[in-house]
């Protein structure tokens, strides 16, 4: 029962209704709490005890070290397997000069330090959205400080949700933040920021297709050194077999792989660093000259255009860097910085230096191919081969998990058709799995592996995804610095100039080879972007149509007071995307079926641009006039990482907070202005002896729905005098009984049954629309809608309790 659950949460609440400057004291045993301003009489906004701010709070060093160890297993595997294919792709046409090896090594060292360590680990991680990273989190952070969302469903109450403005509002004197906000809220800027976000998202998903192919194929290629009779076809089919098994086990919740096999990645990084030191000492210590950036200049002087083109292969050094930022949610910034600085950086640099030393003595093409496995001492080949396969799979896991999470986030933005999202762990809310996404990732990865057959072509496609995501991240990071961070403008200029200039050079080198592979991820990204744009465009148009055609209050009153309208027992939950007003489908329902339930609640499921919304701040209510008709509007707010409850659980929570609202609404309507304060500790005894001073009116320790106001008359000792005192206040016993009666009515109708009413709106283009709009709306969108999951499945609504109402909108 909802009332019983309400009682479990806390049976008493102190309500203070005051005029002017009057006030009152709390009981001696109570810790006084500051009053909370009520937003308006007909809106419930309950400020509960707020959870602690910050990502992980104050961490102990032991916790940081433990998180750092797990971080190695989940985030560093992809970066740790890049040495498998960097040199063999960079020098695939041979080494022209022995100092070219030192030049490329110098590029690798400074590129890795600049982009992985400086940009991501020490700068970008601080631009997280309450512990979530990636371009999606940057967009969410921007949308909290500027109205860049294309759907007009923002509400003033949203900004009061915990963690909505964790970074603090920029001071009014900070002119650049105000200027940036005004520029971003212009329509062209909104579209541009949205375009960049979904473009980066589409590229990241395309990268999730390419990454498993490159990593696993590079690892399996090492077999040719010990089994030279293996053909390319056999290597490809072995790779495909591993990929199929890898994607097949995703449904079991393989985020656990990262935790279980963190020791595997640690052993891998330790071994490759040890082998790198061994090769350095054995072959050529002189490659340490690569720490002198002069060799980069000499390299470009010697190779000119060819050296510039080879930059595309050098950026493979930091593939997987985006995972450090995107998968921040499980870890703290300190743990990632610690593990990256003291484990990842030295291990990766040692193996690149060791391979360079080996290649200085073995410059022929035979040794350049599979340079990594050739540089390994013979007794360690098989252990390293097995570790390479395992580490590659673990590295792919982080990317695939990112794809599942990204698709879930896209749905909260209404940028992608509804697909099935499963939670594979009850303990970790971020462990997601989507059968549809997993199938297409597996299919495309296998097709790409079978089509290109070698890493050379796939790597070129991989490069374009990496560098474009880097460029977009730099742009969004700069916007965050200007809008949110209180940083000196010259530091922002330095950040933008340094990273945008260097990344543009890398991008130009990759685009030069456009016809040799990079078109593939752009083609995949283009298809994804068309789907995202069409779905979001029609969704925005449909929302605006409903907003323009909301039912007026007079029309609602007229509908509810119709003589032929029948009220049947039970509660009707009417789902709508509209957060303002009554949707136009409501009068359509009454015209077709002039019968509604005794209690009607219009529910709008809304996702805020923050990861999580506490359940105590989830619901906003407003009662629709006339009040005796018991019709309410409710906005249920979720973060983009929050899980939607099962239908029955949702109803239980909804009814609990609806009863709170009924109680508070009646109390708030007694006097104006109103203040509400919540005691910081629970009180189990009545304290009605103190009288309010001046014009203050008190109803202290009001009972929650679980307890009856009529129970007050059952206390024999001294209760009659206290009731007499209470009846002199403005909140009379009759009014309190009215509150109880309304609450009991709600619970009684819930017991009579709950029916879920869903509007099934079909959208078509207006007859006079142009051909492109007709194709987009009538064909592409409706095809996507018919092949996506139905709303009742997304909300876990039982079919026996479902009522659908069909309507057609012309947009």
Swiss-Prot record:
Protein name from the UniProt record: Probable potassium transporter 16
Transmembrane as UniProt keyword: yes
Organism name: Oryza sativa subsp. japonica (Rice)
Classification via NCBIfam families: kup (TIGR00794)
GO biological process terms, semicolon-separated: potassium ion transport
PANTHER family, sorted: OSMOTIC STRESS POTASSIUM TRANSPORTER, POTASSIUM TRANSPORTER 16-RELATED
Cytoplasmic side: 1-66, 122-190, 250-256, 332-337, 401-438, 485-488, 541-811
Extracellular face residues: 88-100, 212-228, 278-310, 359-379, 460-463, 510-519
Membrane spanning residue stretches: 67-87, 101-121, 191-211, 229-249, 257-277, 311-331, 338-358, 380-400, 439-459, 464-484, 489-509, 520-540
Family according to the record: Belongs to the HAK/KUP transporter (TC 2.A.72.3) family.
């Amino acid at each position: 029962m909802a009332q019983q659950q309400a009682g479990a949460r806390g049976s008493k609440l102190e309500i203070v209704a005051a005029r002017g400057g009057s006030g009152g004291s709390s009981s001696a045993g109570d810790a006084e709490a500051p009053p909370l301003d009520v937003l308006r009489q007909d809106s419930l906004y309950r400020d509960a005890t707020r959870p602690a701010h910050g990502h992980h709070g104050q961490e102990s060093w032991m916790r940081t070290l433990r998180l750092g160890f797990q971080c190695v297993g989940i985030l560093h595997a992809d970066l740790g397997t890049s040495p498998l294919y960097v040199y063999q792709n960079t020098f695939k046409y041979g080494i022209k000069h022995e100092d070219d090896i030192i030049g490329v090594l110098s590029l690798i060292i400074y590129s890795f330090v600049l982009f992985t360590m400086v940009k991501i680990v020490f700068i970008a991680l601080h631009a997280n959205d309450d512990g979530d990273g990636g371009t999606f989190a940057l967009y969410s952070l921007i949308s909290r400080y500027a109205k860049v969302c294309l759907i007009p469903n923002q509400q003033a109450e949203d900004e009061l949700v915990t963690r909505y403005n964790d970074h603090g509002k920029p001071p009014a004197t900070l002119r650049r933040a105000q200027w940036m906000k005004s520029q971003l809220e212009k329509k062209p800027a909104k579209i541009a920021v949205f375009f960049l976000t979904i473009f980066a998202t589409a590229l990241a998903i395309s990268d999730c297709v390419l990454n498993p192919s490159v990593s696993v194929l590079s690892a399996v290629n090492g077999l040719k050194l010990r089994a030279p009779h293996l053909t390319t076809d056999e290597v490809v089919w072995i790779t495909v077999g591993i990929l199929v098994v890898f994607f097949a086990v995703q449904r079991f919740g393989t985020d656990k792989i990262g935790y279980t096999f963190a020791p595997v990645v640690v052993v891998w990084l330790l071994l490759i660093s040890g082998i790198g030191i061994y090769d350095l000492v054995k072959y050529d210590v002189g490659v340490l000259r690569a720490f002198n950036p002069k060799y980069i200049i000499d390299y470009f002087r010697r190779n000119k255009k060819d050296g510039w083109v080879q930059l595309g292969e050098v950026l493979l050094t930091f593939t997987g860097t985006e995972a450090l930022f995107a998968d921040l949610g499980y870890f703290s910034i300190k743990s990632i910085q610690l593990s990256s600085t003291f484990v990842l950086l030295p291990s990766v640099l040692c193996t690149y230096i060791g391979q360079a030393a080996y290649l200085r003595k073995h410059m022929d093409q035979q040794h350049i191919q599979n340079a990594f496995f050739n540089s390994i001492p013979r007794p360690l080949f098989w252990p390293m081969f097995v570790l390479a396969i395992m580490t590659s799979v673990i590295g792919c896991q982080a990317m695939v998990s990112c794809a599942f999470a990204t698709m879930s986030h896209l749905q909260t933005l209404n940028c992608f058709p509804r697909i099935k999202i499963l939670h594979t762990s009850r303990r970790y809310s971020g462990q997601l799995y989507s059968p549809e996404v997993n199938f297409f990732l597996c299919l495309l990865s296998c097709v790409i592996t079978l089509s290109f057959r070698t890493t050379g072509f796939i790597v070129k496609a991989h490069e374009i995804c990496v560098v474009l995501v880097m460029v977009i991240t730099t742009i969004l990071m700069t916007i965050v610095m200007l809008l949110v961070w209180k940083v000196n403008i010259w530091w922002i200029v330095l950040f933008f100039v340094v990273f945008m200039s260097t990344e543009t050079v890398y991008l130009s080198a990759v685009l030069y080879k456009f016809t040799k592979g990079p078109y593939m991820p752009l083609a995949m990204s283009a298809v994804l972007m068309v789907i995202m744009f069409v779905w979001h465009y029609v969704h925005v148009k449909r929302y605006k149509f409903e907003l323009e055609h909301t039912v007026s209050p007079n029309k609602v009153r007229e509908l509810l007071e119709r003589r032929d309208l029948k009220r049947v027992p039970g509660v009707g939950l009417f789902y709508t995307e509209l957060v303002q007003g009554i949707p136009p489908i409501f009068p359509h329902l009454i015209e077709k079926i002039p019968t509604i339930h005794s209690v009607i609640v219009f529910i709008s499921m809304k996702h805020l641009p923050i990861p999580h919304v506490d359940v105590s701040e989830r619901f906003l209510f407003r009662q629709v006039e006339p009040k005796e008709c018991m019709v309410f509007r409710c906005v249920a707010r979720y973060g983009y990482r929050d899980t939607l409850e099962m239908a029955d659980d949702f109803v239980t929570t909804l009814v609990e907070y609806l009863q709170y609202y009924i109680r508070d609404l009646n109390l708030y309507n007694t006097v104006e202005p109103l203040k509400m304060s919540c005691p910081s500790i629970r009180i189990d005894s009545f304290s009605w002896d103190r009288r309010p001073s001046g014009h203050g009116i008190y109803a202290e320790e009001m009972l929650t729905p679980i307890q009856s106001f009529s129970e007050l008359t059952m206390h024999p000792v001294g209760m009659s005098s206290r009731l007499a005192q209470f009846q002199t206040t403005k909140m009379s016993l009759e009014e309190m009984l009215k509150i109880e009666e309304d609450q009991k009515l709600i619970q009684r109708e819930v017991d009579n049954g709950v029916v879920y009413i869903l509007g099934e709106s079909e959208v078509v283009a207006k007859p006079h629309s142009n051909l492109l709009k007709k194709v987009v709306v009538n064909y592409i969108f409706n095809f996507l809608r018919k092949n996506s999951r139905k709303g009742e499945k997304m909300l876990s609504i039982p079919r026996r309790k479902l009522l659908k109402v069909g309507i057609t909108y012309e947009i």
